[in-house]
Structure formats: C-alpha cells, structure tokens
C-alpha cells in the first residue's frame, strides 16, 4: 500500500488525478495479465511495473506538443508510452489523437482492446512504419524500439512534418548519442529520467543528415555497384 501511494505522489507532480492514476494502474494490470500469453514486457520488470513502465512513460507528458492534433508512438509494443500518454492527455482534457504503429498482430490487437475499454482517442496501425511515407505528426515518441541512429533516419526519411521527437535512452544512451551526432545534425535537450539513474530522455528537433558523410557513403555504394558490374 505504501508503494501504491509513493507512485501516486510521483505522478502527482504531473497533476494526475486519483481517477487517472487508477486507470493507469488498471492498464498496468492488463499488461501483466496479457504478458502470460504474449511478450509485452520483461517478466523481471513485472514486480516493479508501475515505476519501471507506467511512471517511466508518463514523465514525458510535458514534452508533448499540446498545440498539435496528433502524437505518434512508433514501435508501440504494449502501448508504452502511447496508451499511457493517451490516458494522461484525456485527463488534462487535451484534444489529441494518439497514433500507434505496431506491426505485430497480437500486440496491435491488445492495443485495440485497451483503447476501446478505456475509451481512448487512438488509431492503431498494424503496419511496418519503415514502409510508410510522408507522415505528419505533432510530437513523435519512441521507447525501446530501435537504436537512436536508426530512429533519426526513420523520422528524417518517413515524416514530412513533425514538431519534435522524444526518445527514451537507456544505459548505452550516451554512446548511441555520440554515434548519432557523427552522421546527423539535430537540436536536442537531455532530461534526467525519474525512474533510473542510468537512463535519460532526449527531446529532438530539426533532424538533418550530415551531407558530407552521406555523400561519401553514397560514393562508396556506387563504387561497390560499379565493381559488381565490371565483374559481370
């Protein structure tokens, strides 16, 4: 019981009502229940799932562009963070649709089920987002999906318009960030995670490919292709 109220006090920093906290807890319980059938979260994290998953996702709510009509969760999985954020946005009476991209049939079915039960303003795309083009969104969020350089490439190539990209970074986050800035130009701010000393959040804007390295890469590809043709 003490842990329950401790978690509520953490979320209270984001002006979360008791009713909404209860809804978040119900969502957490549904994840654990469904986890017996499909792999939604690590079994090691179920005992601390409120802090490890729900609060961890909720902490980015203040980074969401509330002036936009949509937010996009790429690689949504169990709805972390998409469903959590949708619940919080409704609590704050913010009119925004949450688009969730998850190519797994079983996980997408779970997302549809909880969205319907909690009456959330979501749209579930059971598709491979890497195959989508000219996407438009306000904020884009992603957690435990792909390495940062891959995510930057996806957003730069597949989204024609967006406000910001919010990325959850883990233990090797600093190393991935160092690798990313070698090939990409982008504005970013770091935010310390509330749930782990080893983690942090990135709020990214204006992603651009570093064209010098990109041209060298393209030149290398052309040389390889030319070499193949000469061998034929």
Report each predicted region and the residues it spans.
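Class I SAM-dependent transferase core
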Residues: 1-66, 72, 105-120
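Residue-level signal for inorganic ion chemistry
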Residues: 31, 85, 169, 204
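Class I S-adenosylmethionine-dependent transferase superfamily signal
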Residues: 85, 155-156
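Active-site capping/gating segments
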Residues: 172-232
């Amino acid at each position: 019981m003490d842990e329950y109220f401790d978690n509520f006090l953490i979320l209270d920093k984001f002006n979360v009502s008791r009713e909404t906290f209860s809804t978040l807890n119900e969502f957490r319980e549904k994840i654990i229940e469904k986890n017996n059938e499909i792999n939604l979260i690590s079994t090691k994290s179920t005992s601390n799932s409120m802090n490890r998953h729900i609060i961890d996702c909720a902490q980015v709510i203040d980074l969401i562009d509330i002036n936009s009509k949509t937010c996009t969760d790429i690689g949504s999985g169990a709805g972390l963070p998409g469903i959590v954020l949708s619940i919080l946005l409704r609590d704050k009476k913010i009119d925004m649709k949450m688009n969730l991209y998850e190519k797994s049939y079983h996980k997408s079915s779970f997302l549809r089920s909880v969205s319907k039960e909690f009456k959330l303003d979501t749209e579930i795309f059971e598709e491979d987002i890497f195959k989508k083009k000219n996407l438009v969104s306000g904020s884009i969020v992603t957690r435990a999906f792909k390495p940062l350089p891959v995510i930057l490439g996806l957003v730069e190539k597949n989204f024609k318009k967006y406000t910001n990209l919010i990325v959850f970074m883990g233990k090797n986050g600093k190393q991935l960030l160092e690798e990313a800035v070698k090939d990409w130009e982008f504005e970013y701010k770091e935010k310390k995670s509330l749930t782990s000393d080893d983690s942090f959040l990135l709020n990214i804007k204006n992603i651009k490919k570093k064209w010098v390295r990109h041209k060298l890469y393209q030149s290398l590809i052309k040389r390889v292709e030319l070499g193949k043709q000469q061998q034929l």
